[in-house]
Amino acid sequence: MSETRKLYYEDVYKKEFTAKVLECRECEKGFEIILDQSAFYPEGGGQPCDLGTLNGIAVLDVQEKDREIVHYTKEAVEAGSEVIGKIDWDRRFDLMQQHSGEHIVSGLVHEAYGYDNVGFHMRSDVITVDLSGVLTEAQLAEIEAETNQKIWENSEVEITYPSKEELEKLSYRSKKELTGQVRLVRFPGSDLCACCGTHVTHTGEIGAVKILTVENFHEGIRLTMICGKRVMDYLNMVNDQNRQVSVKLSAKIGETAVAVGRLQDENFRLKGQVAHVVDELCRAEADRWEGEGSVLLFHDGLEADQVRKMADAVMQKCSGCCAVFSSNGDGSYKYAMGELNGDLRQFTKEMNAALNGRGGGKPFFVQGSVKASEEEIRQFFRQ
């Protein structure tokens, strides 16, 4: 068994290469293709594998097994033949930006606060970083600002393979115990870490880093962040959304939050007025039907809690069952029914069956919805 020559370490920007097919083995995934050399990075170190093609055949997965790089395809390639490999470069460069950006963030956090990166995952939209301690929003803002400053300095990223003796004299980050040759990746002024992944050669290629969210995770926190082109994609999306909001609210781009605040205040005020009107309506209906027996009411435009409130108010004064229905505007109605000291369970079961409804509650008070017209509802109650 021979070791595959790793072209991605020799030239991380190699997008296309030629190689000899050493083996092509059938497997559950399709075929395992072993080459004498490869620019396809195999999954490892928290970084997804490269994708691309071999002679136009899609490479669906890449793993390293016993020093061999295994390319998984759905089609066979003849052993002994020569193939042209092509890397999905846009994807690879995106992953390089994410991985390199994460290193700088993790290194600066470790240097400033002593916290470790205890978990790292690259997704197609964001990356997550799990830290062993808690940082405030202000501290994270400082880390983000310093990270971007390091990026814009455009320092050369250094990759070395120190001897065992040299390693003993170095202070570097590592997520696990290391055996064999150690590959160190240095981001000047921010991080020195043992890593097998692919990285940019100059920090400026990362472009920018943006921390999107932070949440508590175990004893520390989980950061969700983006780097490189993803930052521009995110900025374009946020800017487009903000522009639409500014148009709808007739507000300047930089004043949408203030405009939304005014809208919220107005909405709160109007909700208070509506609640007052509904309370008055409930009292009026309760007075209207006092002592009148069972009552069936239809009032459009009510929310579920308002339907419940009206049914409860009328139930207290009528001498039977009160059922209140309010249209949802889509051919269905929300309802609430109540009867003091009554048991509506069987009636509700029959009504839901007849009117395509669902709902339930206590024996004397139920809520739910039905898919029926007003006339169909009235017809059922006339039975």
Question: PLM features: what roles do these ranges have?
Answer:
Residues 1-383:
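A glycine- and charged-residue-rich anion-binding loop/surface
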